């Protein structure tokens, strides 16, 4: 996955009032934290953050920070992004500093590949798990995990344990949890007028 640059500025003041002022000026408050360091409050451009996490892979892009206070050149990933529930705009971001020599746990999107036999037979595809948690080195984070549904028939499911692991990537979670299923045909009952 490609690395992207994210400009940040150190924040000396914190609180609701400062956060509101930042948002009015198209900036959002954030914090950078990680192993062996104190949390550092920062602010960053809303547009720049949206651009940095746009596209497939989203929040899992490796971001190189540019800014003062010893943050210049630090590698981070978006640990949490709070968004306005009505507008969908970012309100706060947590950036997790990562060590390239340590494995990280991230959630990646599931990409369904192929046309399921069960769907062709009239079944209904139930895509239950859109993201899967994995563990790998930061340079091995995939944009998505492909799951082939071609052979899936009515009444059958693919579980986390059925996902083929890629080299250097460990799929986490309960192996018995369903990722995708093919449900049986739905019978339509005639509508009876009263």
Curated annotation (Swiss-Prot):
Entries under InterPro entries matching the protein: Rbsml_bL25/Gln-tRNA_synth_N, Ribosomal_bL25/Gln-tRNA_synth, Ribosomal_bL25_b-dom, Ribosomal_bL25_C, Ribosomal_bL25_long, Ribosomal_L25_dom, Ribosomal_uL5_bac-type
GO-annotated molecular function: 5S rRNA binding; structural constituent of ribosome
Keywords (A to Z) from UniProt: Ribonucleoprotein, Ribosomal protein, RNA-binding, rRNA-binding
GO cellular component, one term: cytosolic large ribosomal subunit
Pfam families given in the database record: Ribosomal_L25p, Ribosomal_TL5_C
Superkingdom of origin organism: Bacteria
Gene Ontology BP annotations: translation
KW Iron-sulfur (keyword) present: no
Residues passing through the membrane, by range: none
Oligomer status and interactors: Part of the 50S ribosomal subunit; part of the 5S rRNA/L5/L18/L25 subcomplex. Contacts the 5S rRNA. Binds to the 5S rRNA independently of L5 and L18.
Family: Belongs to the bacterial ribosomal protein bL25 family. CTC subfamily.
Main function: This is one of the proteins that binds to the 5S RNA in the ribosome where it forms part of the central protuberance.
Protein name: Large ribosomal subunit protein bL25
Organism of provenance: Geotalea uraniireducens (strain Rf4)
Lineage: Bacteria, Pseudomonadati, Thermodesulfobacteriota, Desulfuromonadia, Geobacterales
Gene: rplY
């Amino acid at each position: 996955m490609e690395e992207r640059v994210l400009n940040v500025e150190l924040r000396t003041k914190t609180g609701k009032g400062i956060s509101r002022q930042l948002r009015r000026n198209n900036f959002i408050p954030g914090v950078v934290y990680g192993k062996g360091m104190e949390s550092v409050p920062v602010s960053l451009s809303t547009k720049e953050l949206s651009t940095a996490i746009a596209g497939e892979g989203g929040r899992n892009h490796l971001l190189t920070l540019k800014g003062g206070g010893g943050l210049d050149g630090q590698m981070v990933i978006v640990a949490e992004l709070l968004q306005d529930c009505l507008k969908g705009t970012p309100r706060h971001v947590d950036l997790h500093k990562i060590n390239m020599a340590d494995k990280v746990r991230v959630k990646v999107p599931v990409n369904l590949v192929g046309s399921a036999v069960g769907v062709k037979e009239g079944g209904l595809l139930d895509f239950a798990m859109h993201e899967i948690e994995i563990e790998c080195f930061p340079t091995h984070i995939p944009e998505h995990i492909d799951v082939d549904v071609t052979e899936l028939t009515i009444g059958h499911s693919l579980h986390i344990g059925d996902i083929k692991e890629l080299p250097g990537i460990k799929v986490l979670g309960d192996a018995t949890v369903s990722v995708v299923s093919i449900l049986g045909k739905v019978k339509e009952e005639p509508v009876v007028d009263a």
